[in-house]
Amino acid sequence: MQKSCGENERKPQNMPKAEEDRPLEAVPQEAEGNPQPSEEGVSQEAEGNLRGGLTQPGQGYKEDSPVRHLDPEEMIRGADELERLREEIRRVRNKFVMMHWKQRHSRSRPYPVCFRP
């Protein structure tokens, strides 16, 4: 007997249960204090964190972040430094381009040119 399309759409047969539907596993008292590694070498505590999703960041997270508000003077100093570095990169790039061009177009070649008779 076949099910109608509506019944097939409502309940997928091979879908894993959601985390809310799963019963919580009882952890023995001795395992809580001393986590033992599983087959892959990952402790059960760390394995549980992966299953439960990502952990929340600590309270001091915002203070430790590298992104911070700068005063306008610091921003101007940083922009000046960036411009100076760009000019230096441009200068070095032009230097290498000229060296490459001179090597390719020089009349004195590092190897003799052989003409076939």
Swiss-Prot record:
The keyword Coiled coil applies. One of its GO terms (cellular component) is nucleus. Residues 73-100 form a coiled coil. The keyword Nucleus applies. Residues 1-24, 61-74 have a biased composition (Basic and acidic residues). InterPro entries: TF_A-like/BEX (IPR021156). Pfam families: BEX (PF04538). It comes from the Eukaryota. It is found in: Nucleus. Keywords: Coiled coil, Nucleus, Transcription, Transcription regulation. May be involved in transcriptional regulation. Belongs to the TFS-II family. TFA subfamily. This is Transcription elongation factor A protein-like 8. It comes from Bos taurus (Bovine).
